[in-house]
From Swiss-Prot:
A GO term, aspect molecular function: ATP binding
Protein name as it appears in the record: Growth-regulating factor 2
Residues in WRC domain copies: 87-131
Keyword terms, alphabetized: Activator, Nucleus, Transcription, Transcription regulation
Function according to Swiss-Prot or TrEMBL: Transcription activator that plays a regulatory role in gibberellin-induced stem elongation.
Segments carrying motif Bipartite nuclear localization signal: 83-102, 120-127
Main location: nucleus
Organism per entry: Oryza sativa subsp. japonica
Amino acid sequence: MMAGGGSGRCLFTATQWQELEHQALIYKYMAAGAPVPPDLLLHLRHRAAAAAAADVDTVPSLAFPPHHLGWGCYGAAAAQYGRRVEDPEPGRCRRTDGKKWRCSREAYGESKYCEKHMHRGKNRSRKPVEMPPPAAAAVYRPSALSISPPPHDADAPSYGAGAGAPLQLHLDSFHASTSPPPSYHRYAHTSSAPLFPSSAAGYGGGWSLSKEHCLTLGGAAADLSLDKPADHHHDATSATTEKPLRRFFDEWPRSDDGRTPWDGTQLSISIPTAAAASPDLAIAGAASRYHSNGDHLRTSE
C-alpha cells in the first residue's frame, strides 16, 4: 500500500504486510464458519515466540497479553446471562438462601436436594393424610347387660318380701377387641346394687329356692325343696328331679332294698326368724316348735 501525496513511501514494511495478509486469511475462515487450518495457527505461534525474544518496543502487539481461544474468558459473563455453570460440589444439597449459606447435607439419590428440602417447594396441603392401621383403630366396647324378670306364670310359687325373684341375665358382647384395657374395670363400671338378693346369698347362683307352705312364727316346720336347673351340657328335654328335704332322717323314704338312698348331696338349711332378735320370743318359739313336733309325731303314729 502506497501513501498518498506523491511521496512514494510505503506505510507498512514487507514483513508487516505479509502478517496482515496472513491475519486476513484467518479472519475469512472464521467468518465463513469453517475450521482454521493448523498450519496457519502454527505460523502464528512461531511468530509470537520470535517476537518474545526480540525487543518489546519493536513489536506493538506484544504490549497486550494474548487471549486464549475458546469460551474461558466469557465464563463469568455466560453465568450472568443464564448459561448453566457446573456445580463445584455435585453430591451436596443445592438448597441455599440466595446468599452465602448452603445446605451441608448430601443430596438424596438422583435429586438435587436432601430429604429435608426435597418437598420444600411443593404445596403441603396436598400431602396425603396418614391413616392409622385398622388394628390400632379398634376400641373396646363394654358388653350390653340387660336384666329382665322371668315370665309370670299362674302356677309359679309366690315369693315373699324377704326373698326376691330370680333374675335372667342376657349378655350381648360386641367383640370389638380381644381383651379390655387394663383401666376399664377401675372407674364407673361396677354395679351399684347386687344382682341377686341377700336372702339367696347362701345358695349358689344356679339354685332357686321355692316354698311349698307358708312359714309362720312358731308354726310347723316347712318342707323345702331344692331345685337344681339342668346342666347346659345335658339334653334340654330331660326333666329335673325334685326331692323334698326332711328334718329327720327317719322321715326319708326307704328304697326297695331297704337302704336309704344317699345318691344326692346332703344339705342342711336353717331359716332365721324374727324370734332370734329377742330372748323371750326365742324361748316362746322353741316351746311352740316342741309342741308342734309332738303333735306331728302323734299324728304320724
